[in-house]
């Protein structure tokens, strides 16, 4: 029983230390490292999203309302054919 308690406490201790090491991050970045990290994120799409503005296009805006029902799907049985 004592052996199991020691093993269990050792496992829990290493799991605690491991979780602290995994969740930690460096605290003091130097100016060189900050510039490197900033340039890294500027090249990614996240930097592009943050710097982008509204699109100049119309998007999905419906221009002519009388044409809206032309694209309605007519449900019903499918035409008979060879199938799959």
From Swiss-Prot:
* Residues bearing the modification 4-hydroxyproline: 77, 79
Q: Would you indicate the residue range of the signal peptide?
A: 1-24
Entry comment on modification after translation: Contains 4-hydroxyproline; hydroxylated on Pro-77 and Pro-79.
Composition-biased stretches, type Basic and acidic residues, lie in 58-70
What keywords are annotated for this sequence in UniProt? Apoplast, Hydroxylation, Secreted, Signal
InterPro entries (UniProt xref): PIP2/PIPL1
* Superkingdom field: Eukaryota
Q: Where is it mainly found?
A: secreted
Taken from the UniProt entry, a GO cellular component term is: apoplast
Q: Where does this one sit in the cell?
A: Secreted, Extracellular space, Apoplast
A Gene Ontology biological process noted in the UniProt record is: innate immune response
Where is region (Disordered) located? 50-84
Query: Tell me, what does this protein do in biology?
Result: Endogenous secreted peptide that acts as elicitor of immune response and positive regulator of defense response. Amplifies the immune response triggered by flg22, the active epitope of bacterial flagellin. Acts as a negative regulator of root growth.
Supply the name of the protein. PAMP-induced secreted peptide 2
Organism equals Arabidopsis thaliana
Q: Which gene encodes it?
A: PIP2
